[in-house]
């Protein structure tokens, strides 16, 4: 068994939080020891030592500012991280990037205490750099590449992402392609109605449900979806927006003329069972992002048998290729959706067939078991090589 010190996020909720929670839970279920290190105790606390107990699997580091995207650590965070790692004595340090400017110090810090360092590199990308958001994300890759080259292994989600990092100088031999995975036994089509399902359905009301679930940020490109929905005749159909983020107040204000029988702003949803129930009830899931990595929300929707429409950015187009969903370009999203949405509304049998193909694709390629099998292999190889 392997003892992993996991550097990740617990809050605010985002894809990185989902990735860390699902991966570490599965590792623990397989008998591995996981110590979760994250930014949690505010820097203005009076604590002089890391929030660490000998029998506590979690370590909290101080921060100045924390958001869905990035955290600014307290000046003493690096010292506290080093002290924690020296006490924990893990076999592996695994960082779920990006977290904070402390990311760039990890290779040197782990080298000082002779610990192998693995990173999962989440930032979204678009190989074609078709917009300003994609160009901004490319800068993130350029900024991180020199540091990533000093990690012992870097986990990426697709061959395309691997090529981008290789062009920036990150050794291909250090990069391991391990796509995201979801638990198909949790994210599954509704088999039998339950209290959670009934409660969610009551809140949503009658009608067919079309869904976006994720961060409400500029790069998620939700506005074209809302514009298209507003201009489409959607009798007995509702668009539900689940999530939170910096663009939410602006978009809510811009589309305040849409009544609740056409558009529902659900807000952030932390409860797993509720998120599963929403996905199960939804007929179609939209992901109109300008840039992506490999969206966990997309995989979760596919696993529940929900028909999916996503842009061809990051690895999402690859996930839905050959009929597992509808792939659109990041160019003129609104125009494409104005054509697609009426078809999906008028042909429920088509959405049902798409949903079935989507779940088949997840079972074939993107289960959590396959993901953890591959991560375990990386851990064991590194642990053995450091022993020798």
Where are these regions (language model features)?
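Nucleotide-activated donor-binding/catalytic signature segment of Leloir-type glycosyltransferases, i.e.
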Residues: 252-270
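Short alpha-helical donor nucleotide-sugar binding micro-motif in glycosyltransferases
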Residues: 268, 277-282
């Amino acid at each position: 068994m392997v003892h992993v010190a996991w550097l990740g996020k617990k809050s605010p909720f985002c894809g990185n939080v989902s990735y860390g929670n699902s991966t570490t839970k599965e590792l623990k279920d397989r008998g591995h020891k996981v110590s979760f290190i994250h930014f949690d105790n505010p820097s203005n606390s009076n604590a002089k030592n890391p929030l660490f107990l000998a029998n506590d699997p979690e370590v909290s580091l101080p921060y100045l500012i924390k958001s869905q995207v990035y955290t600014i650590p307290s000046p003493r965070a690096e010292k506290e991280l080093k002290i924690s790692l020296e006490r924990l004595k893990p076999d592996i340090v695994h960082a779920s990037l990006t977290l904070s400017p402390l990311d760039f110090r990890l290779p040197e810090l782990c080298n000082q205490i002779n610990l192998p360092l693995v990173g999962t590199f989440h930032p979204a990308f678009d190989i074609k750099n078709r917009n300003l958001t994609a160009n901004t994300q490319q800068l993130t890759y350029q900024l991180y590449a020199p540091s990533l080259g000093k990690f012992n292994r870097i986990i990426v989600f697709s061959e395309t992402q691997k090529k981008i990092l290789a062009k920036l100088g990150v050794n291909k031999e250090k990069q391991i392609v391990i796509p995201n995975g979801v638990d198909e036994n949790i994210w599954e089509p509704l088999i039998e109605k339950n209290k959670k399902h009934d409660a969610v359905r009551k809140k949503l009301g009658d009608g067919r449900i079309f869904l976006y679930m994720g961060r409400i940020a500029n790069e998620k490109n939700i506005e074209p979806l809302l514009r298209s929905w507003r201009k489409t005749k959607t009798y007995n159909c509702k668009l539900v927006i689940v999530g939170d983020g910096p663009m939410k107040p602006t978009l809510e204000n811009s589309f305040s003329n849409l009544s609740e029988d056409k558009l529902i702003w659900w807000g952030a949803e932390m409860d797993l069972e509720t998120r599963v129930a929403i996905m199960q009830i939804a007929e179609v899931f939209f992901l109109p992002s300008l840039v992506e990595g490999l969206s966990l929300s997309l995989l979760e929707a596919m696993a529940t048998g929900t028909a999916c429409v996503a842009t061809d950015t990051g690895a999402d187009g690859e996930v839905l290729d050959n009929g597992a969903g509808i792939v659109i370009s990041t160019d003129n999203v609104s125009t494409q959706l104005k054509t697609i949405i009426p078809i999906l509304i008028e042909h429920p049998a088509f959405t049902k067939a798409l949903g079935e193909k989507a779940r088949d694709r997840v079972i074939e390629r993107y289960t959590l078991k396959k993901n953890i099998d591959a991560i375990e292999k990386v851990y064991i190889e590194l642990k053995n090589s450091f022993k020798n």
